[in-house]
Amino acid sequence: MAVKVNKEFCSFCGKRQDEVLILIAGPNNTYICDECVEKCYQIVRENKKTSYNFELKDIPKPEQIKKILDEYVIGQERAKKILSVAVYNHYKRIKAKEAGLSLDDVELEKSNILLIGPTGSGKTLLARTLAKILNVPFAIADATSLTEAGYVGEDVENVLVRLLQACDYDVKAAQKGIVYIDEIDKIAKKSGINPSITRDVSGEGVQQALLKIVEGSVVNVPPQGGRKHPHQEFIQVDTTDILFICGGAFVGLEDIIKQRLGKSRVGFEAEIKKVDKEQDLLELVEPDDLIRFGMIPEFIGRFPVIATLRELTEDELVRILVEPKNALVKQYQKLFELEGVKLTFTEKALREIAKEAIRRKTGARGLRAIMEDIMADIMFEVPSLPGVKEVIIDENVVKNKEKPKLIFEQAV
């Protein structure tokens, strides 16, 4: 008697009927097993979770955007207001276009943003938080790694590859995303007596290459990044509605502003001090100052919104340590809480940490490194110390590397 062979198997994973719990039949002798159904459902669920579709009514008003920025970014009030308005107007323009509203009578230009401020003043955090508020894809690129096509380094199109990767290559979502390009001041034109001796492959050439992307055009993007080659398939990305935010320290820009104001000459020093006291010199920046710095006019023209950030004060650095939702002190306190231990920082300790960040000229960015240095030994020791109920960090721990005070539970 012939043995009947069971030929039914899952068309997705190839497992036979006796290897799975359920095998569901479809048309044309196709089947899917319960395991693959569960995987498909999980994929659909994840895609819904990371959906970037949003309606105009879902875009927070400028006041709401700033309020959320306040939860993560301390200080920089003027910059937060400028960014809130610019981002709101940018996405309002997109939704008006999607709704089919006529914009023929007035051309609404894209509000790309240029952030100018010292290291650790919050430029990257502002851009990242904006993307989080709006639930849009976000990517960060470093301008120093970009070079002209044909030279060692990254093509400018690679900044769009990162954006595509951030939303699993959902082109429609990427086309509403935010790209932050850091250290944009490092691609300023080289200057000197004879600047043409060596080709400026990471300066003016990169600015020219970025022009096409930031102004809004359809760009051929290599899907896996890297250099383009003739046989490679490209993904077409329309950058018209992508918001580009560029940030840089622009060291020396203040001197250019002073020269323009005519306040670097003898007899005007008192007036310079007055300007410095009343408002940061950077707030007086004009496009011509950036052009003199080394940015090309066409590039600066693509960034109509300029927001300046000032160096953070000691008080603001202390607030950064304790106030934001992701404040470092809160994070360490939670880690100690999981060990059943209370962690306390004295006010003087927090101020010493802030002073050290100012001394290192690292701003808020350097706070974590300082905290890690302070906490490394005690975090190593506490889990092995029985009966510890509180750890107190005072100024001597920060300044003199002394041991923190330990409070133990009293034996019954």
Curated annotation (Swiss-Prot):
GO molecular function: ATP binding; ATP hydrolysis activity; ATP-dependent protein folding chaperone; protein dimerization activity; unfolded protein binding; zinc ion binding
Sequence similarity: Belongs to the ClpX chaperone family.
Function: ATP-dependent specificity component of the Clp protease. It directs the protease to specific substrates. Can perform chaperone functions in the absence of ClpP.
HAMAP family the UniProt entry points to: ClpX
Domain ClpX-type ZB as annotated: residue spans: 1-52
Gene Ontology CC annotations of this record: HslUV protease complex
Positions with a binding annotation for Zn(2+): 10, 13, 33, 36
InterPro entries (UniProt xref): AAA+_ATPase, ATP-dep_Clp_protease_ClpX, ATPase_AAA_core, Clp_ATPase_C, Clp_protease_ATP-bd_su_ClpX, ClpX_bact, P-loop_NTPase, Znf_CppX_C4
Complex and partners: Component of the ClpX-ClpP complex. Forms a hexameric ring that, in the presence of ATP, binds to fourteen ClpP subunits assembled into a disk-like structure with a central cavity, resembling the structure of eukaryotic proteasomes.
Stretches of the chain forming a coiled coil according to its record: none
SUPFAM superfamilies (UniProt xref): Glucocorticoid receptor-like (DNA-binding domain) (SSF57716), P-loop containing nucleoside triphosphate hydrolases (SSF52540)
Gene behind the chain: clpX
Identification of the protein by name: ATP-dependent Clp protease ATP-binding subunit ClpX
Keywords noted in UniProt: ATP-binding, Chaperone, Metal-binding, Nucleotide-binding, Zinc
